[in-house]
Structure formats: structure tokens, C-alpha cells
Design a protein with these regions (language model features):
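A compositional/biophysical signature of low hydrophobicity enriched in polar/charged and small residues
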Residues: 1-119
Length: 119
């Protein structure tokens, strides 16, 4: 109900609403995930700010494990992805990158909302 949605919004559970763009309908056929290795921890602020300026980078996460940052990129095709890597990512002074190309998104969903105490 609208009252419930308003309550969830007021609690900060719902942050807003957005349109979901079909990347293939707007010409972006390639979805890639990239693990980024930084040369030094001091690069985090400058690299994340630079990544915000690259429109094809749609997500950026600080991670544990082998990568310093993990990003999601949409590109028109594999050649465009290569161009993004060479012309936009390499100039950031990264130690190295690892790419994973997604063939197809199997599913995507939001986490379930359970506001009841589980005590």
C-alpha cells in the first residue's frame, strides 16, 4: 500500500525509485566486471573519483580479497570495451586489471524486506 511505501521511505529502507534501462536497447551489448589492482592504497580517493567520470562504469565496490576495487562496465561491444580499458582505465595508473565478461544476466533482484524482529 502507499502508506507502507511511505513508511519504508521515511525509515530510509527505500532510497528512491529509478528507471531500469535495457542496455541492449540503447546499444550496449557487452557487460563486463573488472577487478582493479591499485599501485598503492593512497590511490583509492583519486581512482574512485576518476571512475565516477567514466559513464560506462555503472558500479564500483571496495572489496576484500584479491582486488582493491571491483567495477561493472557496459560497452557497445568488445572493441569498445578494449578502448575503455586502454583510453580510460589504464591512464588511472592501475597496477593491473582482470576482466570477466558476462554472457547473459540470469536474474537480478532486490533483497527481501522483513521489518519484523527475529528475536
Amino acid at each position: 500500500s502507499d502508506v507502507y511505501k511511505r513508511q519504508l521511505t521515511n525509515l530510509g529502507v527505500i532510497k528512491g525509485s529509478e528507471f531500469i534501462v535495457d542496455n541492449t536497447k540503447v546499444g550496449y551489448e557487452t557487460c563486463a566486471y573488472m577487478g582493479l589492482y591499485l599501485k598503492s592504497p593512497g590511490q583509492f580517493p583519486s581512482v574512485t573519483e576518476a571512475l565516477k567520470e567514466i559513464p560506462e562504469v555503472v558500479e564500483c565496490h571496495y572489496t576484500t580479497g584479491q582486488y582493491d576495487l571491483f567495477i561493472k562496465i557496459y560497452a557497445k561491444n568488445n572493441q569498445h570495451l578494449l578502448s575503455i580499458i586502454h583510453n580510460k582505465l589504464q591512464p588511472l595508473g592501475l597496477a593491473r586489471t582482470e576482466s570477466l565478461i558476462s554472457f547473459k544476466e540470469a536474474f537480478k533482484r532486490q533483497i527481501p524486506i522483513d521489518l519484523e524482529d527475529e528475536d
